[in-house]
Amino acid sequence: MKPFMDADFLLQTDTAKTLYHEAAEKMPIFDYHNHLNPQEILEDRQMENLTRVWLGGDHYKWRAMRAMGFSEDLITGNADDYDKYLAFAETIENAIGNPLYHWTHLELQRYFGITTPLSRAAAKEIWDEANAKLQTKEFTVRNLILNQHVSHLCTTDDPADDLHCHLALQLSLIHISEPTRLRCIS
């Protein structure tokens, strides 16, 4: 049986595999849309746990959790971080075919080296392994960005946000270009 989301995930032809592995895989990433908080990049925040990484500001994940019927307390409310994570694990387990399913597992593999599919049954093991890594120096916000070879990233800020973090990032020693990109929701 083929491994779950292996190095050739989504690469179905020999040409695709050659183009990706011999060219694109080594190229720097130009991240034109993300949910990263410029303040957390500036401060080089050390995330407390996987819930803070995944559910701190991602409306796509929140929407999926709402569609699963979870209470707002388990999504953006004051519930315990582990309980929020378990709700997200159950959501992902039921999201096969949704891009969130693939994104979640790519993040687990690329950042944490975890190849076990996220589910309620595997949640505790994944939580413990990922959180142990999040407490190391290699897993600060800036190091996570740099270790993925990001050369440019554009945050999606609120039009009313103060841009002082962007200016400070441009003047800091971080070696990525970080222009502001505003996204208006109508």
Task: Indicate residue ranges for each PLM-predicted region.
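Short glycine-/acidic-enriched loop or helix-start segments at secondary-structure transitions
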Residues: I41, C165, I185-S186
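An N-terminal structural lobe/cap that precedes and organizes the functional/catalytic core
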Residues: M1-K84
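Alpha-helical scaffold segments that flank or form the walls of functional sites
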Residues: M47-Q170
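Short amphipathic alpha-helices and their capping/turn segments at secondary-structure boundaries
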Residues: K17-E25, L163-L173
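Active-site beta-loop-alpha junctions enriched in small/polar residues
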Residues: H35, D157-D158, R181
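Single conserved hydrophobic/aromatic residue that forms the stacking wall/gate
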Residues: I174-S186
